[in-house]
Amino acid sequence: MCVGKNTYLCNMKILKFTPIYKKKVWGSETWVVSAVPESTSVLENGETDGELANGVSLPELVRRYGADFLGRKNWEHFGAEFPLLVKFIDAHDDLSIQVHPNDELAQERHGCMGKTEMWFVMDAGPGARLYSGFKERISPYEYEKRVEDGSITDVLQCHSVNRGDVFFIPAGRIHAICGGIRLAEIQQTSDVTYRIFDYNRPGLDGKMRELHTELAKDAIDYTVYPTYQTDYLSKINNPVAITHCPYFTVKIHNITRPYHRKLYKYDSFVIYICLNGDCMIREHRRRLFPKSNMDTVTLTKGESCVVPMACADIDLVPNNDRGLTELLEVYVDNKKFG
């Protein structure tokens, strides 16, 4: 049972979804919160039947609960379209050099959202690296020549990677994750990727994977930026914002003790992603309800949950036997929606 801001009652709860595993030629992905068609998350911690039954899809929950799920401004802006996708990427080998279109181009070509994303590196092997952005200015003509002769990586900025590193990848930024990295990815609800260079390797079906070099040419931002990595200073028991953009805000929590989160101010659903350790996320205790009615979920490393807007008064309770618990908190800052 969740209590709304003005003691409004609804039967929503903190939600966990069944992970969706996807095998890739370079490793694997695990989609933990998704409303992408053909890959939609379904409820894992629901009831045996009813509106919150196990197996109910995320899009169906959004349609049923509307603003109580998404928040009022999100509901007015997105309607029944859940705006974010959360996945874990486990790269054993290098991913393709790629880029994603912005909203305007994606809507024009594919009838969907664009794809802006961010990465939080959870594990990185010795010598781990990734590509993000250009290190020198090139023209669309030079781009085509370098894709053709296989030298495109020579003009990309290569970053050495360590655990805890954060990279913001706006639509239009050329990029690639390389082998030996496991990361959490938060992005817009979109599965549109323009593959530019794929090391001349076959896919899992033995056939060469399709490239989208012409589509990518118009989607790429050729600007050279002074930095591509996000710097931040984490604090104990005090959330720190690490990404803020029109599509999502991400904060990191490093917690050693329970603390209370009043999330109503966001007017948004909130996603929690466990990066390390484990913790309980539970309804904040209220006099109005007995303790037995408090909704609780447990997250371990690599798990996530969604806190609907109607359940936005919670406690984060770490398992101190496991040391420091590290969480990402994700929501949509919808003040710009008016």
Regions inferred by a protein language model and the residue ranges of each:
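Short beta-strand segments in beta-sandwich/barrel cores
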Residues: 260-261, 277-282
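Transition-metal
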Residues: 1-138, 198-225, 250, 332-338
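Ligand-binding loop in jelly-roll beta-barrel domains
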Residues: 79-81, 89-94, 103, 113, ...
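His/acidic/aromatic-lined binding-pocket segments of jelly-roll/cupin-type domains
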Residues: 86, 95, 117-120, 158-159, ...
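Loop-centered beta-sheet repeat module
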Residues: 147-194
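Compact, glycine/acidic-enriched structural inserts
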Residues: 127, 135-148, 153
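Short acidic-glycine-tyrosine-enriched beta hairpin
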Residues: 156-168, 284-311
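C-terminal amphipathic alpha-helical segment
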Residues: 194-266
